[in-house]
């Protein structure tokens, strides 16, 4: 693409960083919930079912968001669609902070989830379309790095707000309650700060040159659906959707959503479990930086092979701790070590690779719609694992749950080996030609 090549390296990097800022909001909005669940449940007298709804309602919004994001971005453009997602984040953060009751809180969480769903599709597509082939993996991985920064930011905010909160405060002023006896409001509302930065900087980046070119060739949306039924493209969408949904059943989101609860079940205090979760966030972010550096050198599939292999070992070790830890005299240090190693293996492989692959493996004329379908599969998997994890921990026991996660890594490895091409260093047009064979 000539218009892409005419941009300086610094300009492309700036554009990619701005688009990746949406990932910070994605990560923050996803992870902040872990520090608010218990106090929200106590304040609004939630049943276990209602508590699950509080955790899962944003995922419903995300599923709706990914379902429409591809068509929105193909119709309105990548830039305007990112702007819509930023506005949704703003409405959600402010609304959650001032919610008068549980119903309002759920509504604003769903709105935020919609923003996550839209951004998780459009930002990686946008970055892949403005990036040169030799740097595309690194630049799209900025989005995953931003997600991990968002996770870490949420964990730090949760830890610091809880540490500084006066839980006995009787001051009725909302501003006081927000960081004291109703500190969940402050945790959720702090998302407004990075969102404003994202919202402002979107106005300083151009529309995707590839979208501008394809826009003139597209007659209506029915052509996209027709193109999806072409044999090669249909298989690309199928395999992309399968790796998206299977990746959610390998334990990563169970750790991110329920990490503090799992650590508490292992015997850590409330503050100790929250601090351990901060360590998880630090390892997640630093490992993603490493993945960003090596992904275009090592290759997508090599990272997945080694990383998922390590995940299996760590999941088996964690399952062993919960099954036979007492008999083997294993301390909580053993659990934390393999938790952190598991996060390292996940961040260096599937977490770093998934958005890169999904954003680059589809032809430009159907990229938005195809990635929406794969993204929908990803978020359905995320929702299911969010809802099923408490049941699995209780019914299968923590040991059985982590052994199951280890087993689910095997079909993922098979699909990556047999059906997904190595895309490192290839132009988007070369990748498209692979699926046409």
Task: Map each language-model feature to its residues.
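Alpha-helical transmembrane bundle of multi-pass membrane proteins
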Residues: 1-216, 220-437
């Amino acid at each position: 693409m000539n218009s892409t090549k005419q941009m300086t390296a610094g300009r492309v990097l700036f554009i990619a960083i701005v688009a990746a800022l949406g990932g910070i909001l994605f990560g923050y909005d996803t992870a902040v919930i872990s520090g608010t669940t218990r106090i929200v449940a106590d304040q609004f007298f939630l049943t276990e079912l209602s508590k699950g709804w509080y955790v899962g309602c944003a995922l419903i919004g995300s599923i709706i968001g990914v379902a429409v994001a591809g068509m929105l971005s193909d119709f309105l453009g990548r830039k305007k669609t990112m702007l819509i997602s930023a506005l949704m984040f703003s409405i959600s953060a402010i609304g959650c902070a001032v919610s008068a009751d549980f119903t309002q809180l759920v509504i604003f969480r769903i709105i935020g989830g919609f923003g996550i769903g839209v951004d998780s599709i459009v930002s990686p597509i946008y970055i892949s379309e403005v990036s040169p082939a030799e740097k595309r993996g690194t630049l799209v991985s900025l989005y995953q790095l931003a997600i991990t920064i968002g996770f870490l930011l949420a964990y730090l905010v949760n830890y610091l707000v809880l540490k500084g909160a006066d839980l006995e405060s009787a001051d009725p002023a909302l501003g006081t309650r927000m960081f004291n006896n109703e500190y969940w409001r402050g945790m959720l509302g702090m998302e407004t700060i990075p969102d404003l930065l994202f919202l402002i900087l979107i106005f300083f980046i151009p529309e995707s040159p590839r979208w501008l070119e394809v826009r003139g060739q597209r007659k209506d949306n029915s052509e996209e659906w027709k193109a999806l039924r072409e044999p090669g493209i249909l298989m690309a969408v199928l395999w992309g959707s399968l790796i998206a949904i299977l990746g959610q059943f390998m334990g990563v989101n169970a750790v991110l959503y329920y990490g503090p609860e799992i650590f508490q079940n292992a015997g850590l205090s409330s503050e100790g479990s929250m601090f351990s979760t901060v360590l998880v966030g630090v390892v997640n972010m630093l490992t993603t930086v490493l993945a960003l550096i090596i992904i275009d050198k090592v290759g997508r599939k090599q990272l997945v092979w080694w990383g998922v292999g390590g995940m299996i070992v760590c999941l088996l070790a964690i399952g062993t701790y919960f099954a036979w830890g007492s008999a083997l005299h294993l301390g909580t240090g053993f659990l934390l070590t393999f938790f952190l190693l598991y996060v390292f293996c996940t961040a260096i492989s599937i977490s770093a690779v998934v958005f890169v692959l999904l954003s680059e493996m589809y032809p430009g004329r159907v990229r938005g719609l195809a990635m929406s379908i794969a993204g929908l599969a990803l978020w359905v998997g995320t929702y299911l694992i969010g809802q099923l994890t408490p049941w699995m921990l209780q019914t299968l026991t923590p040991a059985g749950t982590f052994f199951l996660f280890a087993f689910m890594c095997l079909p993922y490895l098979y699909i990556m080996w047999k059906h997904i091409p190595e895309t490192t260093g290839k132009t988007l047009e070369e990748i498209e030609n692979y699926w046409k064979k």
